Amino acid sequence: MSSCKTTLSEMVGSVTKDRGTINVKARTRSSNVTFKPPVTHDMVRSLFDPTLKKSLLEKCIALAIISNFFICYWVFQRFGLQFTKYFFLVQYLFWRIAYNLGIGLVLHYQSHYETLTNCAKTHAIFSKIPHNKDANSNFSTNSNSFSEKFWNFIRKFCQYEIRSKMPKEYDLFAYPEEINVWLIFRQFVDLILMQDFVTYIIYVYLSIPYSWVQIFNWRSLLGVILILFNIWVKLDAHRVVKDYAWYWGDFFFLEESELIFDGVFNISPHPMYSIGYLGYYGLSLICNDYKVLLVSVFGHYSQFLFLKYVENPHIERTYGDGTDSDSQMNSRIDDLISKENYDYSRPLINMGLSFNNFNKLRFTDYFTIGTVAALMLGAIMNARFINLNYLFITVFVTKLVSWLFISTILYKQSQSKWFTRLFLENGYTQVYSYEQWQFIYNYYLVLTYTLMIIYTGLQIWSNFSNINNSQLIFGLILVALQTWCDKETRLAISDFGWFYGDFFLSNYISTRKLTSQGIYRYLNHPEAVLGVVGVWGTVLMTNFAVTNIILAVLWTLTNFILVKFIETPHVNKIYGKTKRVSGVGKTLLGLKPLRQVSDIVNRIENIIIKSLVDESKNSNGGAELLPKNYQDNKEWNILIQEAMDSVATRLSPYCELKIENEQIETNFVLPTPVTLNWKMPIELYNGDDWIGLYKVIDTRADREKTRVGSGGHWSATSKDSYMNHGLRHKESVTEIKATEKYVQGKVTFDTSLLYFENGIYEFRYHSGNSHKVLLISTPFEISLPVLNTTTPELFEKDLTEFLTKVNVLKDGKFRPLGNKFFGMDSLKQLIKNSIGVELSSEYMRRVNGDAHVISHRAWDIKQTLDSLA
């Protein structure tokens, strides 16, 4: 059986109609001679269908197959069960080697050099006139050499075989040698494959336990299911690919057929070599014999070697590697990151028992591997003293806590680019933050799986006498399956996808399209399905230990939640909400019963959604009974009440506290000063009266007395007051005069007295050297300016001008000592208010408050974050 891209069965051979009912054309590989392939039949029909013509070889093959059962009976009667089992085991190993090594070598040379075809041409095996009768031949017509007789015999035998096998209308000499060689090659394939199958079945039959109690159990039920599934795989595969791909036809000639992916080829890569061998494991379950299981594993593994070293190289030479631009997108992103960031190196990745991309100059790599080595050595050296209960708790808590940490990072990164912002604000690059994430994620995987391996190993070691060998091997197979899934996933999505690169470097994505190559052609989320089978394998290995079941459930749930509630919403946001149906989904929905169930579920879902929508409408119906503008009037009344409360002046005609131009401007953008006009009856005025600036939210609880400190945001009403508090009060008092009835003045709050924080504020006039409130101003708003961020130069210009006015800039550097109210936090808030980026205090101190560096850094971060949007 051959393959293309993944298998020939999936590409060139994927013709779902019978070759006899459609006009399929073929051409030879080297000479490009076109022809119409003859009608052929599958292996079973060719050998056992009495309505079809049989050649001599086919009769011999059928006889050899049937004779196996008589030989089995005779050997069993004469030598006993054990000898018979080993006798057929040796036979199976012989035919398996003949299959994978023998046929493999023949196909290897046929693929590279067309050895069989050239041999047939050289010796005129399928010609009317043999070479020894050709005038140009070097052979003498009277030669009696053994070689001549041998090839004449081969010529006559092969021609007789084809004539006795094919219909009368088949013209042997009208077809090119390639098709005739292929027809003869099929005969030997039939012999090897049928003998391989029959000897294996006899060996398994002899290994089945005699006790009915041992046969009728859950293992046998599962085994029968796997066998039936295996039969369906084989039948459906032949339905799709026909004999051409089944017998490696493209090693001899090429069919011109449409590419149709159907049936079993939508479920698994290389289905004939992967799920096509599940029957092996079904029979092993029924036998409950680890020896049968080991033989099955050997047969399956040798088939994968055949695929790797024979079929795949041929397919790549003949059809290319089957990759397209979409499948290479993530790989190109990895290359682009390396190209644009000279200090970037590929991350350390743990794959099974190996580490990839180890960098001897990267400390985190040593830390990761050192952690694994320390844990393993510690477990081995202290195996007798480790309390398994404490170790279980350690594994459980480590997995849960680290998963919560990882999930939180991914969720916040998806929502607000939190992780990237954290590093950008501290002076690092976007790619550097991604590198740190790569270390964190890989370390999380390495740590949790190392602890799981240690715990499972100690569980097996402490209870080895009760461990079932077959369960142990099946568990290891599941571990191998998960390792394979991880490797295939990484191969399909590259390092960029493996480390959730679209969460951190979405600006590197040029094509917003999800890959459907490799394992993602069959499963949408392989990591959620096959990514935990190895953990369930530990359940088998430990004979269904409760603690391992708990850990397996934890692994499964955390995987599911991460994919369902974090990864999938983010993918929809980045690539669009397109429903991608996997190959497995297509095949299952193609089955009528499952399609009907799916339709029923969809209808139920629509009914539930409709009922919820109707309920929501009914619950909102009460609001329609209220006046149309009821809610608007309610909000307006609240605003009026607050305004009335804020104006807390006494009922004296000379009590006044007003902000200049308050009718025009209620929002003061810093560094604009706020000028306050006040008036007080002369009998109430005290030279120690003072005015404080407060946040409304801090003082609204008490209108008669201020119970919070002003924090230095206050001014005297007279230049002669509070002389020991410095000159700033004299500078803020810009005017004061007295008449017979009242005293009035003007106070200006500039950047030396104002808050540098967005909010609603009010002024309070206090009596004497106390906190008794006499007057309260109308609330007003103070806000930080929005600087020009069109270019980094304009942003720097506006920033330096503002800092100069606030008196915190010296020699181009931020110096907070110039204004005690404008500190590092105020600068951070100013930048965030203008450009939406928050730099860390540590970073600004690291660059010595350089306004040029800070402004350009903030602008660069803004550009980076915008590109991620």
From Swiss-Prot:
Main location: endoplasmic reticulum
Membrane topology: Multi-pass membrane protein
Pfam family of the protein (one): PEMT
Any GO CC annotation of this UniProt entry: endoplasmic reticulum membrane
Gene assigned in the entry: CHO2
Similarity comment text for this entry: Belongs to the class VI-like SAM-binding methyltransferase superfamily. CHO2 family.
GO molecular function: phosphatidylethanolamine N-methyltransferase activity
Organism ancestry: Eukaryota, Fungi, Dikarya, Ascomycota, Saccharomycotina
Cytoplasmic face of the membrane: 77-86, 209-212, 280-291, 384-389, 461-463, 556-869
Name used for this protein in its record: Phosphatidylethanolamine N-methyltransferase
Pathway: Phospholipid metabolism; phosphatidylcholine biosynthesis
Organism (species): Saccharomyces cerevisiae (strain JAY291)
TM segment ranges: 56-76, 87-107, 188-208, 213-233, 259-279, 292-310, 363-383, 390-410, 440-460, 464-484, 535-555
